[in-house]
Amino acid sequence: MKVGIVGNGMIVPIAIEAMLRAEIKVTALWCRNEAKGKPIVEKYQIQNQYTDYQAFLNDDSFDTVYIGLTNALHYQYAKDAILAGKHVIVEKPFTVTLAEAKELQELAIKHECMLFEAILSRYSKNYEHLKDELIKIGKIKLIQANFSKYSSRYDEFRKGTITPTFDKAHGGGALMDLNVYNIHFVVGLFGLPKKVQYYPNLAENGVDTSGILIMEYPDFQAVCTAAKDSTSDPFVIIQAEDGTIVYPERPGYVRYGERYDRLTNLTEEIDIVVEEDPMKNEFLYIQEIIDTKNTEQMNAWLEKSTMTVTVLEQALQSILQG
């Protein structure tokens, strides 16, 4: 796998460094503003830089496009890349509407391209192992997930400067940027809920700076909290009749966990694989799926991405419905 990068946002250098740690070559960068892209090109010695997206897609030095743009742009740039015959890795959220998600999945299948959403928990062996741990705690009753982090852009926003991360037109807000991690964590394990209700704190421009999402399942409730206007320790807690599982980290990471057994009154560490570099693992796993042409796994993941976008869309609709 050789990668061409799209964008120059905060996530891009982080992703490039993870790729380099995974010994994945980055050969090109597209950025609308050449001056903003130049420092990235120089720092990581990327051989080709473009401001014309079609010229970028015509570059045969890479086979995979990584899209690190604002949320609302994911769909169109991913679509164009697939139509150009490139594999695509899209940062979360996959898309901002369900129709967009379904179209991208159909296009990837039609054009025999591999398509992925970059969401860390999905590529964690420990997350997969969690499914075995759930059996040990009995009937699930409550799930709580929290990812609250004061945004580096929030001070500007409070002064009246609207950046994409706090702009509804760009798919910004706490639901799309942070609560998506919580939703992925829950939906990846339990599928679609039967009901979704979102209770946001809305700013004057209508964007949600924080909020609580409730997902109702047949036998339990999942409460997902996210904030870009305040900070608290992240966690995931899964409460069941015979025990409780706790992960004291953001839902994207599954690196340490404890399981409490109500019947024995004992708490044990969950047996996990040491994953000190989740993003490196993510790209290595994606590379493996591309190299082995494992479309079955790709499609299974895309179904989960589509489910997550379904929840996001229903959450936004629930605000309008009151």
Write out the residue ranges for each language-model feature.
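Beta-loop-alpha module in the N-terminal Rossmann-like domain of NAD(P)-dependent dehydrogenases
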Residues: 5, 15, 44, 48-107
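N-terminal Rossmann-like dinucleotide-binding module
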Residues: 1-44
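C-terminal helix-rich "cap/oligomerization" subdomain common to oxidoreductases
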Residues: 64-66, 285-322
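Hydrophobic residues in well-ordered beta-strands that form the structural core
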Residues: 90, 115-117, 247
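Contiguous beta-strand/loop segments that form the cofactor/metal-binding neighborhood of enzyme cores
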Residues: 183-253, 284-289
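Rossmann-fold dehydrogenase core element
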Residues: 103-120, 141-142
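Predominantly a Rossmann-like dinucleotide-binding segment in NAD(P)-dependent oxidoreductases
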Residues: 121-193, 322
